[in-house]
């Protein structure tokens, strides 16, 4: 019954809403999606830079010495260094703190200025890191990068979901994940080239070139219109109608415009006009409990797939299993290319197959490949970490890492960003997305901090640890995640109210209020 009701909403919307995928909205979403470049570039650049001897020699000489004298050291432990880990993870701690302030900024000034602020902050951090003279400059630069990631990570997914036609929301929103994968791949290519620069300054090129994607989103955002939902929420109704006409390519937008206004009017029906000033309190109310649970659990599960272990530390990990410096960087390039190609699979299927099927299939693929990777590494190095790996077996491990990355890239990667951005009602959307980003940053920080020590102590069992979590999240999705494909974000409440489990959080008064709002739309 629940699934049929949600499907009926999607079908009714497709028949009532006018408009199509216009070139204007495609270009607009494409420019906004470049916010993912800064996120992806940093993910890809960090692991490559920390595998460069010149970078380690300047900022972390003890790690370089440990690596070079690792004959008696476990392969699992030779890169274990708290200062090195802090360099990588400091960005995500900064993004965690910033995300709570970014929500108010995004709600008050709109999505486009939030994206602009992210680009400017990331540009400042890239400049500081490229010119770094000491570890303190590196960390301050990382903090500025983290603030930029918080701005873009919160505002861009919301913007894409609000601008896209409902039937194509998944495809256009996943453009953000595509840009993240392009950023990772570009960073891997930059690292591969920078490692060959003579004179020991190649790492400056890697870190400094983060300014390029920062400039793209900062400049591009200046030419973007704000989304109709954001404009309505700030009382700019006529401007919202004009933007809606342009992005839909038709003057017949009364039905969609009316639904957007009605969704904004739910604030008054439920709580009165003052609710506009208290989204943080409202998002904790019972009727938003289902969305809040997903906003917390989806990014939590996404990070416990172990993907950032691969993306942060791919060159270091490949060095650990016995590949040389150039070979490890090239292997990271290969996984980055797989990431891009597999993301196109999600773009092509997310609005036809739906979210649930992709998450289930991707979860099964990641589970199997992680178990195989852990087993192969365990066979070679055992629990002691001693031993040498053959080139053939190293290549085999890289292949299964690529299988794992592909499974993530068409499931938990893009959908971990899409789902939190499309499930919240307008009045609490920035606050809800802020919570999702904060959880993502907290979990990313924890994984980045813990990975090298966990690899040292858990050894190959670390991959079994992550595969266990993949099993848990796959079962969770099967039982508790409703299908949201094709359902307009202004009508998303029906998906939760008719769900077998989440429906209990909606009382009759809530349902009556929702009907009242729907009947009063203009």
Curated annotation (Swiss-Prot):
**Which residues face the membrane's Cytoplasmic side?**
1-24, 104-111, 156-169, 226-291, 351-361, 413-434, 481-522
Membrane topology note? Multi-pass membrane protein
Q: Which SUPFAM superfamilies match?
A: MFS general substrate transporter
Task: Kindly give the CDD domains that the UniProt entry links to this protein.
Answer: MFS_STP
- Pfam families from the entry? Sugar_tr
Query: Out of the domains of life, which is the source?
Result: Eukaryota
**Transmembrane stretches, start-end:** 25-45, 83-103, 112-132, 135-155, 170-190, 205-225, 292-312, 330-350, 362-382, 392-412, 435-455, 460-480
GO cellular component, alphabetical, reads: membrane
Q: Which residues lie on this side of the membrane: Extracellular?
A: 46-82, 133-134, 191-204, 313-329, 383-391, 456-459
Give the UniProt keywords, A-Z.
Membrane, Sugar transport, Symport, Transmembrane, Transmembrane helix, Transport
**Principal location:** membrane
Q: Which family does it belong to?
A: Belongs to the major facilitator superfamily. Sugar transporter (TC 2.A.1.1) family.
Q: Which NCBIfam families match?
A: SP (TIGR00879)
Give a short account of what the protein does: Mediates active uptake of hexoses by sugar:proton symport. Can transport glucose.
Q: What is this protein called?
A: Sugar transport protein MST2
Organism, by scientific name, is Oryza sativa subsp. japonica (Rice)
